[in-house]
Amino acid sequence: MKIYVGSFTTESNEKAPYKTQIQNYDLIQGDELLSVLGVKDIFEEENVEAISGYYANANAASIVEEDTFRYIEKKIIEGIKNHIHELDGIYLHLHGASYVENIGSGDHHILKEIRKIVGPYLPIAVSCDPHGNLTKEYVESLQIIRSYRENPHIDATETKNHTIKLLIDLIRHHEKIHAVYRKLPLILGGEQSVSADEPVRSINDYMNQLEEDEKIMSVSWHVGYLRHDCPEAGCGIVVVPTKEKYQKYAEKIADDLKSYVWNKRYEFHYTGKTAEPEVALQMALECDKKTFVLTDSGDNTTSGSTGWNTFVLRQFLAVKNLKKNILFGSIKDEYTYKQLDKININASEMIYLGMNKDELSKSVVLNVKKLKKADIILVHGEKVIGTLGQGILVHVIG
């Protein structure tokens, strides 16, 4: 048995003031792809040959430049064309929240182009992030599609391996099935879908119960993605039957799950405490019990924001007689990074931190001591899946 493996991951925030280009992607071709995806062992355990295709990962980013996407899509499809006569199936990891200029969803476009080449019957399985958008055409052209259960996505590697195992079993048993899709008229943000909180915890428990049915192979609830404008935005339900004769039964289960989620629509809420910036600052200053974590949700780089806001930093710098030790997460400023990269560890330097792109990213003058330089890594669970460049840790003097 031979299965082609490819991956395209981009989460497109249309508010980001830049286009995602080829240099923004981690690109891998060859056997290293399997290790980075965390799926090498499953193929060895099942005695199945994985044909490594192409991997492109920009993580959370912006609208993708069309030429960049065309290149990536071409590389993924080239691998399939080169091995089409020996393939028993295709496994793809597609995030689901990409948006390409002049095209729309890159994920959907890739699958449509692949189906033009291999036809409607070659088994294709997709693992994906639940924060992606679906359509009936996209889902039902797949034999299997499975999203992560957990948010944060601590089960990402587990889900990829599970999806591959489902594909292998499907190929071995020669069942002609396809995934079933239901659309929900519901749009949610990631902060409203934390899996340790209700109602997502109950939804996941219900899906686990549904999968105990021998007629059902896989069940997924897809939260959707709302940070770019597209007609397919919103929640979706996917159910995959174990056998062709259970296809209609899967339709019923999809309706049941759709109703279950819909009936909980008023339970969705923002997890955690939220406050306006001035109130949040005061809460942090007055907290004397334990470490206080304050996040600027409007500058969330894991959703494609720029990461260059200095607003909260300037709030703390304006506090007179500050009695607390404050650790700031990364602030993006490539010019200041280059300046600090030239000096030695423990050396001091005067810097202007801030990109001055707008009012929120105004620069501030700081006298700092360089402490450390290291990679900024991206982790899913315990698996390092990529890097986001390098960062420099400094101590503000005075």
Sequence positions of predicted segments:
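Gly-rich Lys/Arg/Thr-decorated short loops/hinges at beta-loop-alpha junctions or inter-strand turns
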Residues: 52-63, 93-95, 257-266
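Glycine-rich phosphate/diphosphate-binding loops that line cofactor/substrate pockets in enzymes
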Residues: 1, 45, 52, 78-88, ...
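Active-site histidine-anchored catalytic micro-motif
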Residues: 4, 8-11, 15, 66-73, ...
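Hard-cation-handling environments
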Residues: 191-398
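Low-complexity, highly charged intrinsically disordered N-terminal segments
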Residues: 47-51, 55-68, 72-80
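N-terminal amphipathic/basic leader segments beginning at the initiator methionine
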Residues: 1-46
